[in-house]
Curated annotation (Swiss-Prot):
Record lineage: Eukaryota, Metazoa, Chordata, Craniata, Vertebrata
EC numbers for this chain: 7.1.1.2
Membrane spanning stretches: 22-42, 60-80, 98-118, 147-167, 194-214, 224-244, 255-277, 284-303, 308-330, 350-370, 391-411, 435-455
Gene giving rise to this polypeptide: MT-ND4
PANTHER family: NADH-UBIQUINONE OXIDOREDUCTASE CHAIN 4
Membrane topology category: Multi-pass membrane protein
Protein name stated in the entry: NADH-ubiquinone oxidoreductase chain 4
MF-aspect GO terms: NADH dehydrogenase (ubiquinone) activity; ubiquinone binding
Amino acid sequence: MLKIIIPTMMLMPLTWMSKPNMIWINTTAYSLLISLISLSFLNQLGDNCMSLSLLFFTDSLSAPLLALTTWLLPLMLMASQFHLSKEPLARKKLYITMLILLQLFLIMTFTATELIMFYILFEATLVPTLIIITRWGNQTERLNAGTYFLFYTLVGSLPLLVALLFIQNNMGTLNFLMIQLWAQPLPSSWSNTLLWLACMMAFMVKMPLYGLHLWLPKAHVEAPIAGSMVLAAVLLKLGGYGMMRITALLSPLTSFMAYPFMMLSLWGMTMTSSICLRQTDLKSLIAYSSVSHMALVIVAILIQTPWSYMGATALMIAHGLTSSVLFCLANSNYERTHSRTMILARGLQVLLPLMAAWWLLASLTNLALPPTINLIGELFVVMASFSWSNITIILMGTNIIITALYSLYMLITTQRGKYTYHIKNIKPSFTRENALMTLHLMPLLLLSLNPKVILGPIY
């Protein structure tokens, strides 16, 4: 594991020691190398000593998320160049350092062996994210968004700490590998119900569950581009990862406790998709679509069958790349028109034909068109929930239709129609942006050729 963690740490001195004209090139190139190293953790045997130590370990659930995290850093750096071009040098370096620090915390969170260690790192990711949102966001509402983000996550995860300490006292260990061997079945009683809620609530807020999702659109809309990308692509996955890990402790109780949360997720999924149809703000629309996709993942994890777990892991990876590319496209519009309102930036197909192609591809991946990995994830989740209960297909089907509707609505509003006069002389799309979109969409298509590397621990 150190072969990823130590190079990531050394990216920080690299940033501060680089010449001013080499900052972006150096950090992007080296972070890309690190992300290529992390690919070696995919598809490995479960029992090799490479992936196991007392502090960090990878298995087939954390390896795909680890690869996603490391893959995202070079993409975030590529996306932020224009956004920071007018900032002074020290501030650019600080921004890059914050991204690297966040990356470091995320890598360690996904590979921690102990639940307390996982909790500490889970909370540590808040600090760089908060600084990125509140320091480099675009509007003054970013302070409000930062407060929402911080307090929702903190209040949600405090009971988890108490629950973990209680479990530590009872079991004597919180090691992930020991838990799977030693976990005692939890009978349903009042105290165990509260324990279950305390363990799950932190991750439900992070996912976010419908009803606890108010921080997400705010944080997404106000964050700078790299903040939005890492929030959508990796921070939401912490919730899913934590839920999958901690259900080993709560085994028989989950099947009894999951009903209200599954109903809420299924209902919230349809509701947030419908909210997307009413949005005027482009980033807000993408944020709400994230909520609806993550609701699918919550349902899949709570069903707790091997099939649904595979669907959940595939969907998490797919959603990470898809929402990230959509935020990049929204940002490229924002950099040219200085507005997130879709009606003000319409008809861009005439002016940016290549960007329109990227918009089309991104919208189609968002509505889970084959041959993308999104389809595989959604298909698995829908089939697993259908075999769990036939009635869920009503809400699932409705959600799939509404997803197609808002994806096409977003595409048509931004690309079609008569363009407004204030955007006649905008810049053409840069090579940097085209490379960025390619690096997002390539994995989505390539993974569908060999999906077993991201289908999680059960495959």
